[in-house]
Amino acid sequence: VQLPVSYDAKFRLLESFSPKTLSNDEAVAEWIGMFNIWPIKLTPGLICQGKASPQGNRLPVYRSITTPVLVIGFADDVVTPPHLGKEVADAIPGAQYLQIADTGHLGFLERPEVVNAAVLKFFASMGY
């Protein structure tokens, strides 16, 4: 079943953003407009991505990661809830976890200045 682009745009908005963004009528109109222009299409690449996604518990494998890691969770993410990011960070020895408020699944677009500052601070702490 192929749903209308306008329906898909509204659904994507609800699953992607925080209540704070969703309460801003101007932001909602802009994002719906953008999602209407760029609808999700079931391309071969997207289908392969879905098939390649790991289905099992990967946490035991994460315990062998030795590279410094920053896991960022978005507080209002309904697609990948922040507790799952925390679980990943807890599984990686020495990993840092940061939860960013007022952000949904696309938190890096909602609050890019906060996300970018966190990533830059992490890199700086590593000497980069």
What are these model-predicted stretches?
Residues K41, T80, E110:
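Residue-level signal for the nucleotide or nucleotide-sugar donor/cofactor binding architecture
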Residues I65, V71-G73, D77:
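Short beta-strand/loop motif that positions the catalytic acidic residue
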Residues R12, G50, V88, V115, ...:
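Hydrophobic "lid"/C-terminal helical patch
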Residues Y7-V61:
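Conserved alpha/beta-hydrolase catalytic His-Asp/Glu region
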Residues G94-Y128:
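Catalytic active-site module of serine/aspartate enzymes centered on a nucleophile-bearing elbow/loop
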